[in-house]
Amino acid sequence: MANAAQKKLAAQNKHILTFMLAADLIVNVLFWILRFFVRSGLSKFSKFVYAFASISSGFLHYQLHRAAAPKYDARGSLLYVGQDLLQEGVTSYMVDYMYFSWILIFLAALTSVKVFAFYLLVPIFVVYKAAPLLKMLLQQLKNFKNQALNQPPQQQQQQQQQQHQQHATPSEPVLSKRQQKLRKKAAKYSRP
């Protein structure tokens, strides 16, 4: 079987997407049953927060389904495997957010809608994950600014000083063999 890995990934994605759909439906149905038949009703704010949680996790489920659902032709052969749902990165964060939303919806159904205050952890997590990227971006911008002002950063200055001390005697830069050949060839053909 030449496409065994693709078929395995397609089956895995289909299984995960089916689980996500079932979990989403079960959590939302349990919320409505527990909130309206066992506990008291909801205020407008509570309905708004529930709608936000439910719609955001549903939207992410829809996006993941579009990206990862395997597609088959009329004969049943695999056309498109889909994106791996177990990969790291944005896909992983989307799945984690869905699980986080389901847990909060379920806990809000069992206890109080004050559990939705834990949604404030999401921006904190985003800042935690984005801080190293932002720091790296600011460092690169600082390097670009220094290059534009012809003021190399301190590390580059130190490297230049070391190179200058090592190669203080030759007046011309040392060329590689390839560069020497190219210059010789250019000099040969540039003569009339």
Curated annotation (Swiss-Prot):
GO terms for biological process: meiotic cell cycle; protein insertion into ER membrane; protein targeting to ER; vacuolar protein processing. It is a multi-pass membrane protein. Residues 178-192 have a biased composition (Basic residues). Keywords: Endoplasmic reticulum, Meiosis, Membrane, Transmembrane, Transmembrane helix. It is found in: Endoplasmic reticulum membrane. InterPro entries: SND2/TMEM208. The keyword Transmembrane helix applies. The chain crosses the membrane at residues 16-36, 102-122. It holds the Pfam family TMEM208_SND2. Belongs to the TMEM208 family. PANTHER family: TRANSMEMBRANE PROTEIN 208. May function in a SRP (signal recognition particle) and GET (guided entry of tail-anchored proteins) independent pathway for targeting a broad range of substrate proteins to the endoplasmic reticulum. Has a role in meiosis. This is SRP-independent targeting protein 2 homolog.
